[in-house]
Amino acid sequence: MMSEIKTNLLDLDRDAMRAFFVELGEKPFRADQIMKWIYHFGCDDFDQMNNVNKVLRERLKAIAEIRAPEVSREQRSSDGTIKWALQVGGQEVETVYIPEEDRATLCVSSQVGCALACKFCSTAQQGFNRNLKVSEIIGQVWRAAKIVGGKRPITNVVMMGMGEPLLNLANVIPAMRLMMDDFGYGISKRRVTISTSGVVPALDILGDQIDVALAISLHAPNDKLRSEIMPINDKYNIEDFLAGVRRYLAKSNANGGRVTVEYVLLDHINDDMQHAHELAKVLKDTPSKINLIPFNPFPGNPYGKPSNSRIDRFSKVLMEYGFTVIVRKTRGDDIDAACGQLVGEVIDRTKRTMKNRMQQDGISVKMV
């Protein structure tokens, strides 16, 4: 006889958790109690919850569990960055912890692999398998907080790990609610950031359901170049994307009225001075601060990192237009934890890895 599948309480945001306990015949406040144990104390053992009566504890042990992804590998960088490979149903996703003097940021994955095939991203070359569940997203935060320890182990969360978060809103939104909930991690909405490559319809849905900080992966100042390095641009071009961003900003209080624009600098591809002028002009109607990200190379990729002088010139052009510009300091590159380097272990349903390998070997995909 098969045992009944237990409910993983990490899959439930506060509303769902309260509904779960009401269905058990309990008062809604029980949900708040349990959430505090899970998220404030990092507890995954019902027996340790000493303000919950024994009858309820025994019942919970029979029908529920608190199960976060387990760490399969840990790497520590010389700069303090930590990268974990976490097991999610026979595959792996990567999560990165970035400590600084005044904050501690966790970079969280939303999918196993990624469906979008951006040319400069290591994750994209692995193809795509599936969306992560709520428990597998908030579970990354839970696991990291438990390992790091301390009173406020994580102050900021960025949904910038593996995957396109807006293609998994059904799970990403409840997970972000838990990050911000006072009975969860209590992180300010200004310190929870979602990043997107431009899934415009989902951006409109996001703005109707939750308010968090927004970052956009732009990476090119015109449609021709952007389509070459980011195929999603063929579906949602720059004009449509930025219009969607402005609609989101009109609904949001978490962004201070402007979006963070991420722009990876690829040597002699998108980093010429004309590109900087183009970028300033294309963003003139969209209040922005710009993060310039020098490319982080990975094996098998044709792109290079620009020289410091090219990066500096590009940055100065944008500042002359009045933009706030930050050149992102590369963190964790000695353990492949920098932007665009996350890989994990993906069973590729899109067969992208195989196609890329065949093309490199001069084999036609159509022949196969």
From Swiss-Prot:
It is an enzyme of class 2 (transferase). Its EC number is 2.1.1.192. Its cofactor is [4Fe-4S] cluster. Binds 1 [4Fe-4S] cluster. The cluster is coordinated with 3 cysteines and an exchangeable S-adenosyl-L-methionine. One of its GO terms (molecular function) is rRNA (adenine(2503)-C2-)-methyltransferase activity. It is found in: Cytoplasm. Pfam families: Radical_SAM, RlmN_N. The active site is at E94, C339. GO terms for biological process: rRNA base methylation; tRNA methylation. [4Fe-4S] cluster binds at C114, C118, C121. HAMAP family: RNA_methyltr_RlmN (MF_01849). Reaction proceeds by a ping-pong mechanism involving intermediate methylation of a conserved cysteine residue. Specifically methylates position 2 of adenine 2503 in 23S rRNA and position 2 of adenine 37 in tRNAs. m2A2503 modification seems to play a crucial role in the proofreading step occurring at the peptidyl transferase center and thus would serve to optimize ribosomal fidelity. This is Dual-specificity RNA methyltransferase RlmN. It comes from Aeromonas salmonicida (strain A449).
